[in-house]
Regions:
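Short, well-formed alpha-helical segments that are part of the catalytic scaffolds
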Residues: 2-7, 25-41
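Short beta-strand/loop segment that forms part of the nucleotide-sugar
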Residues: 20, 44-57, 80
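Conserved donor nucleotide-binding strand/loop of the catalytic core
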Residues: 52, 63-89, 93, 97-100
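Short beta-strand-to-loop acidic/aromatic patch adjacent to the donor-nucleotide binding site
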Residues: 102-114
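Conserved donor-nucleotide/metal-binding helix-loop-beta segment in metal-dependent transferases, i.e.
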Residues: 116-138
Length: 406
């Protein structure tokens, strides 16, 4: 796909790649490239390494900022054709380049990360020298950061495929070069997986490749450019959940055989104090408004998808005030499982409408999570997430009966 490549040092082989996908990141990419170069030089000086900027044909000077920053490690710039957006398309260029260069180890880091250090490269690459095929990061996170992972991506991935990968939507990860072929061969390559769905797509494909997977503690929070969490929520929700549901169809022979989940090895945890994550504010009124407005827009569709007992419970929740608002976990699990089955029963255009209808219910789930955890520690909030994951696993026979009865 790459329409443009700049490879001033003529690199034709590499053992290790650090890739930085980007779109209009001229402000930060030089810093990220510098930190990545230091990490490669300091911890993997024995390897033939290269930095690759996989870019969406940015027009803000990203290429110039990347190529001009002084680094000890050689650099390659790859760009998609003009007007071809999406991190997934950047990474598809990367997979092809990994194959061309014969790279054994690949690390990917986001271009806007302010908290990256050279240690990050070590943390994401070193486990692969110990035989792991895919490395997911573990950051110190605020309890309300990435509620999409806490309430959907983590519990569903864990329940379906039997691996406990806490942050499967993370944009930084490592993988063995041999996985590039698996990524290129995956039959699911949709608009969703080309965009926000790419991180969960990679995590899921890697789990199903049956290579050893681990998590690596990054030593602190991930700090990147501040954005309004609602600004891209609809697209993010559609693309992440749509990708999860799409992959359920491809990998059903595997996940239907998985009964319970197993812990995933964690690297890099020490007894040292770590920096606290930035404080996050949540607009509870906005969440409540989005939940209640869903009844006006989607009640008819909900009644087609969900059992009547679920509809009654949603109506009951609608009558709760903000202070008393709650969302029974069993109801939430049944809703997600019913939605996943319905997704595979409708045409492609109707799938988008189904995801639209699920979004306000998700808003209610996030609100309930906030209400339940606002006075507890991050650790206690994590315990709640773990307990809810067990309900997903215990309810899997319900999903199987619905799936097989389609």
């Amino acid at each position: 796909m790459a329409s443009y490549e700049e490879n001033p040092q003529g690199i034709s082989q590499a053992d290790m790649i650090v890739a930085i996908p980007s779109y209009n990141e001229a402000e930060m990419i030089g810093y990220v490239a510098s930190q990545a170069s230091q990490g490669l030089a300091e911890y993997f000086g024995h390897s033939r390494s290269v930095l690759i900027n996989c870019d969406n044909h940015s027009l803000d000077g990203t290429r110039e900022a990347f190529m001009s920053v002084p680094t000890a490690i050689p650099k390659i710039y790859l760009a998609t054709p003009p007007n071809t957006p999406g991190k997934g398309n950047n990474l598809r260029n990367l997979f092809e380049k990994v194959r061309d260069l014969g790279a054994k180890v690949v690390v990917v880091v986001d271009a806007d990360v302010k908290s990256i250090t050279p240690q990050w490269i070590k943390n994401l690459a070193e486990p692969m020298e110990k035989g792991f095929g895919f490395v997911c990061p573990l950051y110190v996170r605020h309890k309300y950061e990435s509620t999409l992972a806490s309430t959907i991506a983590y519990p569903i991935t864990r329940c379906l495929y039997g691996r406990r990968v806490r942050q499967p939507l993370a944009g930084d990860f490592g993988f063995q070069g041999q996985l590039a072929d698996k990524f290129l061969q995956c039959p699911v390559w949709t608009e969703s997986s080309q965009n926000h769905g790419i991180n969960i797509w990679m995590s899921t494909v890697a789990i199903n490749a049956r290579l050893p997977i681990c998590q690596s503690f990054m030593g602190g929070p991930k700090v990147h450019r501040n954005e309004d969490p609602f600004a891209q929520l609809t697209a993010l929700f559609h693309q992440v959940v749509g990708t999860i549901f799409d992959l359920m169809g491809v990998y059903s022979d595997f996940w239907r055989q998985v009964k319970w989940s197993k812990p995933t090895a964690i690297f890099g945890v020490s007894g040292e104090d770590v920096e606290s994550p930035p404080v996050m504010g949540i607009n509870e009124n906005r969440l409540h408004e989005r939940f209640t407005s869903g009844f006006e827009d989607y009640l008819d569709l909900w009644q087609q998808i969900f059992d009547q007992s679920v509809i009654h419970k949603l109506q009951e929740m609608r009558g709760l005030g903000m202070q008393q608002f709650s969302f029974p976990i069993q109801t939430w699990v049944n809703i997600l499982f019913d939605a996943a089955v319905a997704y595979h029963q409708v045409s492609a255009p109707d799938r988008s409408t189904l995801l639209d209808a699920l979004l306000p219910i998700y808003m209610g789930k996030v609100l309930a999570f906030v209400r339940k955890t606002e006075r507890v520690s991050v650790q206690q909030a994590e315990e709640l997430v773990e307990n809810e994951c067990m309900v997903f696993e215990e309810t899997k026979p319900y999903l199987l009966s619905k799936w097989d009865g389609r």
